[in-house]
């Protein structure tokens, strides 16, 4: 445990670095879930989280930063809420799912897949089958929106996103 974060689990740290608005940690959980708690009042420029090997990572709190980078690799990464100006999501053969706090029309969305699928609000944006059939690239070409979202699947994995639905009542979640 440190003064700027807390960890609950049996974990081994290879590296921890807190430098102003950047926090980096490399850790291994020992056959049990690990929970990392960052201060709520933190004003982060960048948050970068990746799953090693076939790890299973769940983020149960809102991640808020200028830039958010999440990578599921070959594991499973679930994020409850991502709030950032620039969001980059990657999966190889793993699965990444995340909730976005605003409606889809507030994001410039670009998605690519070599074989896997990127889904937003239940609709496939890119989806390739074993024969290479399907759509490999998607760009909603949204301009002058507050958020930039890039989703890439480089293997047979999947990225699934759920955003708020644009409506007259902004408090109604999907």
Give the residues covered by each predicted segment.
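Right-handed parallel beta-helix
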Residues: 2-4, 8-80, 133-167
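Short, surface-exposed interaction patches in beta-rich subdomains
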Residues: 78-174
């Amino acid at each position: 445990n440190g003064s700027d974060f807390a960890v609950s689990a049996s974990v081994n740290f290879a590296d921890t670095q807190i430098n102003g608005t950047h926090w980096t940690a490399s850790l291994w959980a020992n056959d049990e879930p690990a929970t990392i708690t960052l201060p709520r009042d933190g004003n982060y420029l960048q948050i970068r989280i990746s799953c090693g090997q076939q790890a299973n990572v769940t983020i149960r709190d809102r991640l808020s930063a200028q830039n958010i980078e999440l990578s599921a690799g070959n594991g499973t990464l679930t994020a409850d809420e991502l709030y950032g100006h620039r969001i980059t999501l990657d999966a190889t053969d793993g699965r990444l799912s995340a909730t976005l706090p605003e409606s889809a029309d507030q994001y410039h969305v670009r998605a690519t897949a070599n074989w896997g699928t990127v889904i937003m609000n239940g609709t496939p944006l890119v989806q390739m089958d074993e024969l290479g059939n399907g759509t490999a690239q998607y760009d909603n070409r949204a301009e002058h929106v507050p958020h930039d979202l890039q989703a890439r699947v480089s293997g047979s994995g999947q990225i699934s996103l759920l955003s708020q639905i644009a409506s007259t009542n902004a408090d109604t979640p999907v």
